C-alpha cells in the first residue's frame, strides 16, 4: 500500500490487538505520556485472553512462601522450555520467567486485579505449584481492568477495525496502518478504509 496523501488519524503509538499483550502495551505507552489507540477487529476487546482461566505462572509469590514451596525463575524457564518441546526462544523464556513476579505485581498494583492470595495451583507441566488464579477465575478480569486503565490514561479503543496493511516508507520504516472501520467478521472487504499514522511505533500484538 502506498503512503496516503492524507492520514485520517495520528497517534504516537498504534497497538494492534487488545488481548493481554496489547492491553499491557497500551497501559505502559499511555503511562509514559504517549497518545495511543488500540485496534481490535472483533466487536469486543480481549480476544482469547478473555477465555483463559485467569491463571498466571509466577515464582516467588507470598503464597508460595507461606506454603514453603521452593521455586525459582530458572526452574520455571526449564519447565517452559521442556513443555514447549524446545521450540521456545531460550532468551525470551528466561526473560518471561525472571519477570513473572514483577508482572504479577504489576497487575495487582497498576491494574487493580484481585487474585486468590490464599493458594497457588499446580498447573500441568509445572514442577511445582506456582499458578496464581484471579478471584473471578477468568482472564477477562485482567483485560477489563487493563483496558479501563489504558482509557483512563487517554488511550482510544477502536473495535470492529480490521488491519488491511502496514504502510512503510521506501526505506522500510513503518509509518502507520491501512484499516477498515465497521468491519464485519470475517468479511475482509467490509468496512470503510481509513489510514492511521503512528508517529513513534506500531505494536503488533494480535493473535
Where are these regions (language model features)?
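Glycine-/small-residue-rich beta->alpha transition segments that form the dinucleotide
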Residues: 42, 183, 199-201, 205-207
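Aromatic pocket-lining residues of Rossmann-like dinucleotide-binding sites
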Residues: 29
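Core beta-strand elements of the Rossmann-like FAD/NAD(P) dinucleotide-binding domain
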Residues: 8-11, 186-201
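Glycine-rich, N-terminal phosphate-binding loop of Rossmann-like dinucleotide-binding domains
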Residues: 18, 60, 181, 206-207
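Beta1/beta-strand and adjacent pyrophosphate-binding region of the FAD-binding site
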Residues: 4-21, 37
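A short, glycine/Asx- and small/polar-enriched loop/turn
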Residues: 168-175, 192
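Conserved N-terminal/central alpha/beta ligand/cofactor-binding core
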Residues: 1-8, 35, 41-156, 160-165, ...
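Short alpha-helical segment within the catalytic ATP-binding CA
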Residues: 24
Amino acid at each position: 500500500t502506498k503512503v496516503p496523501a492524507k492520514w485520517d488519524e495520528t497517534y504516537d503509538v498504534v497497538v494492534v490487538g487488545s488481548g493481554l499483550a496489547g492491553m499491557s502495551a497500551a497501559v505502559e505507552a499511555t503511562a509514559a505520556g504517549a497518545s495511543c489507540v488500540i485496534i481490535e477487529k472483533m466487536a469486543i476487546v480481549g480476544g482469547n485472553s478473555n477465555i483463559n482461566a485467569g491463571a498466571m505462572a509466577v515464582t516467588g509469590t507470598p503464597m508460595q512462601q507461606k506454603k514453603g514451596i521452593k521455586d525459582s525463575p530458572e526452574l520455571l524457564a526449564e519447565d517452559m522450555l521442556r513443555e514447549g518441546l524446545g521450540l521456545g526462544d531460550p532468551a525470551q523464556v528466561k526473560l518471561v520467567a525472571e519477570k513473572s513476579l514483577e508482572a504479577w505485581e504489576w497487575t495487582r498494583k497498576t491494574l487493580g486485579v484481585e487474585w486468590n492470595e490464599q493458594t497457588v495451583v499446580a498447573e500441568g507441566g509445572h514442577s511445582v505449584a506456582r499458578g496464581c488464579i484471579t478471584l473471578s477465575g477468568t482472564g477477562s478480569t485482567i483485560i477489563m481492568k487493563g483496558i479501563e486503565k489504558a482509557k483512563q490514561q487517554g488511550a482510544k479503543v477502536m473495535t470492529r477495525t480490521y488491519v488491511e496493511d502496514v504502510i512503510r516508507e521506501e526505506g522500510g520504516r513503518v509509518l502507520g496502518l491501512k484499516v477498515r472501520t465497521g468491519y464485519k467478521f470475517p468479511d475482509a472487504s467490509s468496512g470503510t478504509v481509513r489510514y492511521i499514522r503512528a508517529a513513534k511505533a506500531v505494536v503488533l500484538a494480535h493473535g
